[in-house]
From Swiss-Prot:
Keyword Repeat recorded: yes
Matches recorded under SUPFAM superfamilies: Defensin-like
GO biological process: defense response
Transmembrane stretches, start-end: none
Main subcellular localisation: secreted
GO cellular component: a single term: extracellular region
Protein name: Helofensin-1
Species this chain originates from: Heloderma suspectum cinctum (Banded Gila monster)
Tissue specificity as recorded in UniProt: Expressed by the mandibular venom gland.
Length: 183
């Protein structure tokens, strides 16, 4: 154990003497390496990391995650077609692809829906998506919306023949609209 520390101390001292002024000779200072989302490591990088340059200590490399690993850590996906307007762009991946993550709030609102607080507002129903934990994505529905679409709230749509169910007025009460006759 003592020999390991002695070896590291000797190599570090040699690195300090051989590098001269930190940041010279094309090597990164520790701060420059950190600015690139990297870490100065002795000898080898952790698995799933790559050497993106050398640090100003002899034998030390500036290690960082690969673009794919960085993207995966941010819960994104590398997409060759680029991000959509409902995505958050987390920067480049390999081969010109972009790291994109669907933004649940943008996605909900882009489709004309709203984010509820704990539950959906009146005249809205949850669509099964979450804007964030405890905030469901809700689409407009209910009696007022049903009427604005030319429908009626009836317990049984069979009261109007022929009909289509075009929404929900309340729990168990569909919004029914008569089909236009085509003849």
């Amino acid at each position: 154990m003592q020999m390991d520390w002695l070896f590291i101390a000797v190599v570090s001292a040699i690195g300090l003497l051989s590098s001269g002024v930190p940041g010279t000779q094309g090597a990164y200072t520790t701060e420059q390496c950190r600015a690139l989302n990297g870490t100065c490591r002795f000898y080898a990088c952790f698995p799933k990391n790559v050497v993106i340059g050398k640090c100003d200590w002899l034998g030390w490399g500036c290690c960082a995650r690969t673009p794919l690993e960085r993207c995966t850590a941010k819960k994104g996906t590398c997409t060759a077609s680029g991000c959509t307007e409902t995505d958050t762009d987390h920067g480049p991946c390999d081969g010109g692809a972009q790291c994109c993550q669907r933004d649940p709030v943008k996605y909900c609102k882009f489709h004309g829906n709203v984010c509820g607080r704990g539950k959906c507002p009146m005249d809205h129903i949850p669509i099964g998506e979450q804007c964030m934990p405890g905030y469901p994505c809700c689409k407009r529905d209910g009696p007022a919306y049903c009427k604005s679409k030319g429908g009626k709230c009836l317990r049984r749509c069979s009261q109007i023949v022929p009909t289509d169910i075009i929404g929900v007025c309340a729990d168990g009460v569909p919004c029914c609209k008569s089909r236009q006759s085509t003849g």
